[in-house]
Each structure stands twice: as C-alpha cells, then as structure tokens.
C-alpha cells in the first residue's frame, strides 16, 4: 500500500474511533438507565455493578403504568403503599403530549402562514421580520418567564395546560418562522404561477402546491418545536402548581423527594420519557436534515 493510502487508512481509523468513543459517551447514560430500570431492587446496588441485568424484571414499568408503587422495603421497614409520583405518571405523560402537540400545532400553523406571506407578498418591512424573529429566539427563554407569568395571571390562566402551550409557542415560534421563511424562499414561485394560470385559487395553490413542497421544512420545524416543548422544565415549574397538571419533566423531579429514591422506578420513568421523541426523530430524521438544509441555495 502506498504511503498516501496508509495515511488515508490511518485517518479513517482515527475518525471512526473518535466517533465511536463519542457515541459511547453519549449513549452510555441511557444504556445504564435502561439497565437499571430492568433490574430488581436487590440488584441495583449489587457489587460489582453490571450493565446487563442478571435477572430482568418489568416491575418498575408496571408500577408506572398501573400507578402502583411502594417505598423502600428492608428488614426493619416494610414496604408501604402511599401516594407516590408513580401514581401520577400516566397523567403527566398525557399532559406532556397535550402541551407538546398543542404548542407545535399552533407554532407550525402561524409560522407557515407567516413565511408564505413574507416570501410571496410585497409590503413594507417584510424583509426585516425574519431577522427580528431570529433575534427573539437568541434571547434566553428565562428572560420571558416572569413577563409571561404576569400575563397568565392577568388572564387567569395560571396552573393550566393552556398557559404552557402559549409559553412554548412564544419560545418556539421565532425559530420556526425563520426556518419556514428560509424554506419558502427555496420554492420556485413559477410553480405557483403555473397553477394560478391553470385556474387554481390562491388558497388551492397554497394547500395543494406549496404545503406538499414545503413538507420537509414543516416537519423540521415541528420536530424542533416538539423537542423544546417536551424537554422544557422552566415553564412547567413556574406556571404549574398542581400535581395533576404537571408535565413529565417537572413530575419526575418528585421522585427525588423524601429520604429514599427508588432508582429503578426513576430510571424507568426516564426511559419512557425518551421514547416518544426518539420515535419521532428516528422516523422523520431525513426530513429534518432536508428542512435544516433548505434555504442554503435560493431556488
């Protein structure tokens, strides 16, 4: 093999080894959480620790789904059935789904219509709006928490899921609109003009020509909005004070309250929290890449 070939092979080995190491570091906490969630309580703190459970059990997942969980059991302290965070897990899961889907639907609807208007109609200030919107996204979301909380108090929306939906729309809409604006710019206007010449109305062109063409951008913006809404902790912690209306990110923190932490139950909750977004991302990742790559070259 020539020196150049040896150098190329060495580069590939270093690159793939580095990528493998980075992937392992990223995935190991999730693998350990999955392993812990499948272990019985007696094995979680066993020495030496094992990544692969010696005996697999689904009791932690069953406790979360059914809402039946017990506190720590030992020889001098029998397990007692009491009000535990596991009893509210399904409720929190549904709350998170409602808030995530609701805020995503509103953000995508507004950003798509706004992006279409900014790229297809001529009016004063349209060239500045996208840049001002992305500036709004660059501001840390924690700055908006107190003003939005005061607004929710005035509207009597505190401790409601609607307050979370509106809060998440306020932090996801700027980037979604900028992303859709960049994508709409890449769609040739000649396609719409041809449909208009054929007798289609503006709404028909938008529904049957623009939206299907802009689908990768819409999916990319939707994934972004869903991830932000699903993972947020700050707004849920400030806006909600009832245990029934909590979302998963806030509710899971209640597993740490008290003198004992049920690590098997906690890890099972963390694994279940990652499942919805992991499924969405894996199913739509090719659209995500196409959406974020849109606008690099204007059509």
List the model feature ranges, each with a label.
Residues 6-7, 12-299:
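A structural signal for multi-pass alpha-helical bundles of membrane permease subunits
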Residues 1-4:
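N-terminal Sec/SRP start-transfer signal
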């Amino acid at each position: 093999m020539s020196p150049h070939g040896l150098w190329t092979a060495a580069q590939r080995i270093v690159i793939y080894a580095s990528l493998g190491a980075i992937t392992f570091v990223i995935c190991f906490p999730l693998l350990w959480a999955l392993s812990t969630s499948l272990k019985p309580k007696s094995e979680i703190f066993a020495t030496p620790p094992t990544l692969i459970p010696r005996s697999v059990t689904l009791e932690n997942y069953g406790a979360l789904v059914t809402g039946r969980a017990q506190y720590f059991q030992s020889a001098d302290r029998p397990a007692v059935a009491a009000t535990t965070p596991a009893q509210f897990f399904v409720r929190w899961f549904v709350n998170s789904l409602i808030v995530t889907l609701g805020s995503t639907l509103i953000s995508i609807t507004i950003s798509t219509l706004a992006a279409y208007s900014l790229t297809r109609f001529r009016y004063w200030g349209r060239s500045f709006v996208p840049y001002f919107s992305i500036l709004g996204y660059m501001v840390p979301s924690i700055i908006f928490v107190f003003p939005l909380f005061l607004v929710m108090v005035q509207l009597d929306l505190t401790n409601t899921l609607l307050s979370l939906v509106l809060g998440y729309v306020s932090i996801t809409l700027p980037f979604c609109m900028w992303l859709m604006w960049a994508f709409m710019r890449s769609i040739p206007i000649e396609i719409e003009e041809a449909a208009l010449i054929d007798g289609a109305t503006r709404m028909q062109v938008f529904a049957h020509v623009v939206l299907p063409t802009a689908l990768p951008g819409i999916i990319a913006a939707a994934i972004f909005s869903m991830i932000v809404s699903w993972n947020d902790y700050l707004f849920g912690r400030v806006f909600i004070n009832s245990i029934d209306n909590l979302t998963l990110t806030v509710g899971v923190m209640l597993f740490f309250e008290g003198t004992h932490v049920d690590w098997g139950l906690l890890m099972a909750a963390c694994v279940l929290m990652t499942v919805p977004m992991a499924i969405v991302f894996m199913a739509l990742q090719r659209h995500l890449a196409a959406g974020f790559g849109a606008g690099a070259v204007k059509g």
